[in-house]
């Protein structure tokens, strides 16, 4: 069968609009509530808190803003108020998911902390509890863990929380990618001490931008709300007694989120159907899909991902910004598949490049299940060496077109394109 390029691009994940969004945006404009207060903001804060299962929600300009204020709050709770012109994490280490987008990590740097990256495990591709326990052995004074749920798949939360509780550490939950996912029947975004979600344009629910901080503490919610409005004091004039930020969500962005929220379950179901069609369509190929804990979790299936078996990988070499490969019959690699998808006007993406491999963070500590991942032979490394799980998944994996508006017929063509790479 001859495959022709798609006339209309098949996206990785683009917004899925329904029309309700326009209603609430128009209302904001018609009533002149277009700034950072209004009925849309009030509504989405109530709706998200109810959906996720927390008492309070604070609407913010983006998920990164939520993560920043969550990290700042955790730092103040553990270490107290910082000195003037210093972050709350000055001189402190924070354990952080390694295979993630850098928005998970950057807020640690905003607060002058040092991220210690924790390797992934193969069951969910998330933070490895074994590596986390190793990290506490090596950095026993660390008291904050930044945990992300990769591609909408919940991490092994109970194991991670038990380790954190043992060491007196707080969890900042980065649920930016996992709104609608559940772990043991609880929504992600409600599991940590401080919780954050994102409404970026590619997320399962979007406001074009936007994010939210979630908590069961009114005191914490009030603190984050104050910080997000430039830390204005309750005074007759503009009074500021601590550093603040312009992190507020606009009532227009909130209108888009408000129109999206009734469709959360529908979006999750569509994403799951995409995942299942890929899984069925790849039968017989030397590949696996991004895994999850079937017994304890239900992902939101935000992005469907593919992992090529080790013995089915052709030669692939990656530099800082480019990649080369040599095609071999019966074998392929992420670079070849992504190039072929692009040729047919479909968008894929490499797996998140692990943070310990990023140029900006190459001097930060990195801990694997065997110990220090920066030193391949020392007292912390077992005799069989150090396995870098995240680097391996990055080398052999890719994100597939996962757009809700992709039809089953279009997805079947995507599957055929990928199958052809193994010929």
Indicate where each model-derived feature is located.
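Structural detector of well-ordered beta-strand residues that form the stable sheet scaffold
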Residues: 95, 116, 171-172, 196, ...
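N-terminal "arm"/small-domain region of PLP-dependent enzymes with the aminotransferase-like
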Residues: 1-34, 401
């Amino acid at each position: 069968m001859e495959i022709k390029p798609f006339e209309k691009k098949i996206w990785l994940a683009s917004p899925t609009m329904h029309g309700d969004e326009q209603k609430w945006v128009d209302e904001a404009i018609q009533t002149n509530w277009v700034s950072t207060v209004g009925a849309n903001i009030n509504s989405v804060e109530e709706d998200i808190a109810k959906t996720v299962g927390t008492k309070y929600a604070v609407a913010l300009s983006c998920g990164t803003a939520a993560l920043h204020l969550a990290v700042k709050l955790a730092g103040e709770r553990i270490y107290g108020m910082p000195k003037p012109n210093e972050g709350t994490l000055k001189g402190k280490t924070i354990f952080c998911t390694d295979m993630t987008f850098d928005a998970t990590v950057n807020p640690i740097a905003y607060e002058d902390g040092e991220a210690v990256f924790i390797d992934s495990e193969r069951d969910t591709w998330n933070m490895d509890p074994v590596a986390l326990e190793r990290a506490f052995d090596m950095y026993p004074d660390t008291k904050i863990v930044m945990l992300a749920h990769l591609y909408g798949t919940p991490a092994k939360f109970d194991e991670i929380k038990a380790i954190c509780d043992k060491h007196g550490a707080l969890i900042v939950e980065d649920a930016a990618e996992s709104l609608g996912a559940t772990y043991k029947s609880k929504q992600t975004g409600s599991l940590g001490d401080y919780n954050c979600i994102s409404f970026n344009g590619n997320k399962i629910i979007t406001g074009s931008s936007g994010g939210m901080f979630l908590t069961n503490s009114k005191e914490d919610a009030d603190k984050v709300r104050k910080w997000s409005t430039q830390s204005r004091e309750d005074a007759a004039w503009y009074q500021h007694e601590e550093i603040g930020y312009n992190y507020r969500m606009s009532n227009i962005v909130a209108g888009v989120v408000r129109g999206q929220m009734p469709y959360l379950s529908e979006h999750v179901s569509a994403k799951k159907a995409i995942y299942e069609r890929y899984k069925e369509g790849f039968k017989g190929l030397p590949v696996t899909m991004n895994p999850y804990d079937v017994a304890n979790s239900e992902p939101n299936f935000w992005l469907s991902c593919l992992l090529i078996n080790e013995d089915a990988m052709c030669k692939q070499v990656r530099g800082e910004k480019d990649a080369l490969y040599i095609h071999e019959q019966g074998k392929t690699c992420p670079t070849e598949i992504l190039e072929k998808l692009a040729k047919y006007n479909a968008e894929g993406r490499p797996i998140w490049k692990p943070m310990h491999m990023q140029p900006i963070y190459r001097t930060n500590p990195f801990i694997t299940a065997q110990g220090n991942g920066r030193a391949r032979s020392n007292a912390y490394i077992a005799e069989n060496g150090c396995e870098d799980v995240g680097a391996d998944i990055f080398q052999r994996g890719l994100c597939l077109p996962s757009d809700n508006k992709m039809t089953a017929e279009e997805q079947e063509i995507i599957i055929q394109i990928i199958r052809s790479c193994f010929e």
